[in-house]
């Protein structure tokens, strides 16, 4: 899980999701998981 100021899609399987006010990226590749913080 990467914590970044600006989250971006790294591939076409990445999806940007808002959960409880936190922007996250979910993907089939676990290395692409990100959270905005």
Curated annotation (Swiss-Prot):
GO BP terms: translation
Coiled coil ranges: none
Molecular function per GO: structural constituent of ribosome
Domain of life, source organism: Bacteria
A GO-annotated cellular component: cytoplasm
Keyword hit for Ribosomal protein: yes
Keywords, sorted A to Z: Ribonucleoprotein, Ribosomal protein
Xref: HAMAP family: Ribosomal_bL36
Family, as annotated: Belongs to the bacterial ribosomal protein bL36 family.
Protein's UniProt name: Large ribosomal subunit protein bL36
Originating gene: rpmJ
